[in-house]
C-alpha cells in the first residue's frame, strides 16, 4: 500500500535523530531508505509538499543538506488512519496499524469502541482471530453463531433472554389438533439484503436445502414435507408430532440464506466485508422488525493484542475497547454473568469400566478439591454440581473401596481450560493406581474426530443457547458424541425417548421428560457437569445498550451511541 510505504520511508528518515534536525547527504538518506539517490529526492520533495518536513540542499555532490521535521510518524499514522476511515477504506486503516502489540494498543485506542464516522454510528470491536465463513447449519464458534443470528433470519426466533420462540419471517403460526400440520404465516414486507423481495417459494427452497444436511436431518427427522400452501403460508407436514418445531426453527442453525446467494440474508445486519482481517456489518434498511440503532459494526482482527492462550478459552472476554480494566481508566465492566453452558465429563461403560468404577471417578471429581484447585485465573470458571439449575448431580456413598482400572483413555476438545483439567485428573488418578492416557482433539466439537472409539472418558463443553432444555434435547439428537458413548440399543432407546418427549404439547411436560433423561444418565454415571463459565463485556463510556446474552455476546440491534456534542 502506497500510504504505508511512504510512512515507513518517513520513519527511516526520522529515526536516527528521533525528529531532531539532521545534517545529512543525499547518499546517506538513499542508503537509509534502501533506494536510489534520485528516488530519495522524489521522496523528500513529496514529503515537503505535504508539509511533513523541510529539506535545504547544499549545491555540490556529497554536500550535507539540512533536514527539518515538522510532524512525528505517530501523528502521521493517526492522521492517515483517520482519513482512511473517513473515506470508508477500513482495509487501509488496518494496514497502517502493523505495529508491535504495545504500540498497536496505543494507536488503535482512539479508533475502537463507538464512533460517529461521517454521521454514521459505528462500533469497532477488536477480535483475537479471523472468523470462519458462515454457512447453513451448525457452526462451531460462539462468535460465528452470534454473527449468523444477526445476518440471517429464521421463520421464528428467540427474543432477548426468552426461552419461548416468537415470530420472525413468519408473524404467527398455527398447529393442527393432532400436531401433524404446522402453518407458518409469512410477512408480506420481507426483503433480502440485496433489496429483492423475499418470496415464500425461496424460503421453501432454503429450508429444503437445510434439511439435506445430515445434522439438520436428525434435528428435523419428524418433518415429512414442506409446502407453499398460499403465497404467504408455509405448511410443515410431520409424520409424528414435534412440539419443539418452533424452537428448532428459531435456533441459529436454522436461519435462512438466499437460496442462490449463501452469504445474503434478511437479518438486521448485512455483510459488506468478510475478510480475514476485517468483518463489517451494515444495518439492513428494509429489515422487517425493529431496526438496529447502529449503522455499522466492524470486527478488527488484531490477534497480536490478545493472549493467545485465552483465544480458545471458554470465556474469551468480549471487549469493545483495547486494554485491560486496569490499563484504561475509562473502560468499564458493562455486564457479567455465569453461563448456563458447562464443561462436562462423560464415561463410556464397557468391560474395562463398569458403573461402580465410573461413579467412583465422578466422586473423585466432585468430592475432592480437584475442581476447586485448578490453576486457572480467578473468576474464569465456577465449579458446578448441577447440569441446569435444579438438575442436581446424584449423591452416592463413599466408593473408595471400588478398585479403578489400571489404565484408562481420556479424549477431550477445546476450550483450553480442559488442558488443565486433563493434567490434574491424570495426576490424581495416578495416585489411585490408574494410568490415564490423554488424547487432545484440537477442535471445538467432536465432528470428524477419529479417536472417539478409543476413549473411556470424554471431556468437552456444551454451549447453552436461548432455550436451555431445548438446547440439551438438540445436543442428544445431533452431537457425534452420543453414538460413541452409548451402545447401539442404548442410543436407539434414547432417540425413542426423545421422540416420545417431543409429542408432549405441554412445555412443562417436555421439560420434565428431558430432566428425567439426564437424571438417568447422571445416575448411571454416563455424564457429569464440571464447571460453568464466567462471561463479561467491557466497554468504554458512551457505548450503551450492552447486555450479555446466552452466548457471551450482546445483541447488536440494541447497542447505541449518543449523538456527538456540537
Language-model segments: which ranges?
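Aromatic- and charge-enriched surface segment that lines or borders ligand/interaction sites
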Residues: 19-22, 41-43, 140-142, 172-215
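Surface-exposed binding/hinge segments that line
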Residues: 66, 216-261, 266-278
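N-terminal lobe/hinge region of extracytoplasmic solute-binding protein
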Residues: 126-175
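A bilobed periplasmic-binding-protein/Venus flytrap-type ligand-binding module shared by bacterial periplasmic
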Residues: 282-285, 335-360, 373
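Ligand-site clamp/hinge motif
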Residues: 286-327
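Periplasmic-binding protein-like
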Residues: 350-392, 520-526
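Extracytoplasmic/peripheral linker and loop segments enriched in polar/acidic and small residues
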Residues: 474-540
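Long beta-strand-rich cores associated with HINT superfamily self-processing modules
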Residues: 539-566
Amino acid at each position: 500500500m502506497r500510504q504505508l510505504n511512504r510512512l515507513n520511508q518517513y520513519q527511516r528518515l526520522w529515526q536516527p535523530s528521533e525528529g531532531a534536525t539532521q545534517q545529512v547527504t543525499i547518499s546517506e538518506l538513499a542508503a537509509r531508505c534502501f533506494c536510489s539517490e534520485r528516488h530519495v529526492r522524489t521522496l523528500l520533495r513529496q514529503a515537503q509538499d505535504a508539509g511533513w518536513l523541510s529539506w535545504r540542499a547544499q549545491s555540490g555532490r556529497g554536500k550535507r543538506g539540512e533536514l527539518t521535521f515538522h510532524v512525528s510518524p505517530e501523528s502521521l499514522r493517526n492522521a492517515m488512519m483517520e482519513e482512511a476511515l473517513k473515506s470508508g477504506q477500513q482495509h487501509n486503516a488496518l494496514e497502517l496499524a502493523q505495529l508491535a502489540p504495545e504500540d498497536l494498543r496505543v494507536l488503535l485506542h482512539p479508533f475502537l469502541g463507538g464512533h460517529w464516522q461521517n454521521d454514521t454510528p459505528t462500533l469497532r470491536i477488536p477480535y483475537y482471530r479471523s472468523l470462519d465463513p458462515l454457512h447453513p447449519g451448525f457452526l462451531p464458534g460462539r462468535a460465528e453463531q452470534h454473527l449468523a443470528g444477526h445476518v440471517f433470519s429464521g421463520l421464528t426466533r428467540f427474543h432477548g433472554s426468552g426461552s419461548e420462540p416468537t415470530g420472525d419471517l413468519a408473524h404467527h403460526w398455527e398447529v393442527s389438533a393432532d400436531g401433524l400440520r404446522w402453518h407458518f404465516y409469512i410477512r408480506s414486507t420481507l426483503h433480502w439484503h440485496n433489496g429483492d423481495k423475499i418470496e415464500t417459494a425461496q424460503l421453501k427452497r432454503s429450508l429444503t436445502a437445510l434439511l439435506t444436511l445430515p445434522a439438520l436431518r436428525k434435528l428435523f427427522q419428524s418433518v415429512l414435507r414442506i409446502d407453499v400452501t398460499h403465497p404467504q403460508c408455509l405448511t410443515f407436514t410431520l409424520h409424528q408430532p414435534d412440539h419443539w418445531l418452533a424452537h428448532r426453527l428459531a435456533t441459529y442453525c436454522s436461519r435462512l440464506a438466499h437460496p442462490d446467494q449463501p452469504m445474503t440474508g434478511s437479518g438486521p445486519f448485512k455483510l459488506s466485508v468478510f475478510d480475514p482481517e476485517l468483518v463489517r456489518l451494515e444495518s439492513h434498511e428494509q429489515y422487517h422488525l425493529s431496526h438496529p440503532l447502529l449503522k455499522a459494526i466492524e470486527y478488527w482482527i488484531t490477534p497480536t493484542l490478545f493472549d493467545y492462550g485465552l483465544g480458545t478459552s471458554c470465556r474469551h472476554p468480549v471487549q469493545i475497547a483495547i486494554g485491560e480494566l486496569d490499563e484504561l481508566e475509562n473502560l468499564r465492566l458493562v455486564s457479567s454473568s455465569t453461563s448456563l453452558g458447562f464443561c462436562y465429563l462423560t464415561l463410556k461403560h464397557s468391560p474395562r469400566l463398569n458403573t461402580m468404577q465410573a461413579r467412583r471417578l465422578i466422586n473423585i471429581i466432585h468430592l475432592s478439591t480437584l475442581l476447586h484447585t485448578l490453576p486457572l485465573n480467578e473468576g474464569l470458571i465456577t465449579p458446578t454440581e448441577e447440569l441446569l439449575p435444579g438438575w442436581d448431580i446424584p449423591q452416592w456413598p463413599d466408593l473408595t473401596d471400588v478398585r479403578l482400572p489400571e489404565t484408562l483413555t481420556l479424549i477431550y476438545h477445546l476450550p483450553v481450560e480442559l488442558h488443565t483439567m486433563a493434567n490434574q485428573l491424570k495426576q490424581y488418578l495416578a495416585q489411585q493406581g490408574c494410568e490415564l492416557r490423554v488424547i487432545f482433539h484440537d477442535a471445538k466439537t467432536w465432528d470428524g474426530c477419529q479417536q472417539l472409539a478409543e476413549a473411556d472418558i470424554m471431556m468437552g463443553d456444551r454451549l447453552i443457547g436461548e432455550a436451555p432444555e431445548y438446547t440439551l434435547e438438540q445436543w442428544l439428537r445431533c452431537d457425534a458424541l452420543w453414538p460413541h458413548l452409548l451402545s447401539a440399543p442404548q442410543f436407539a432407546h434414547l432417540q425413542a425417548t426423545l421422540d416420545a418427549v417431543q409429542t408432549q404439547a405441554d412445555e412443562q411436560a417436555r421439560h420434565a421428560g428431558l430432566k428425567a433423561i439426564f437424571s438417568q444418565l447422571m445416575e448411571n454415571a454416563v455424564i457429569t457437569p464440571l464447571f460453568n463459565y464466567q462471561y463479561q463485556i467491557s466497554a468504554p463510556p458512551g457505548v450503551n445498550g450492552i447486555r450479555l446474552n446466552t452466548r457471551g455476546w450482546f445483541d447488536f440491534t440494541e447497542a447505541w451511541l449518543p449523538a456527538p456534542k456540537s
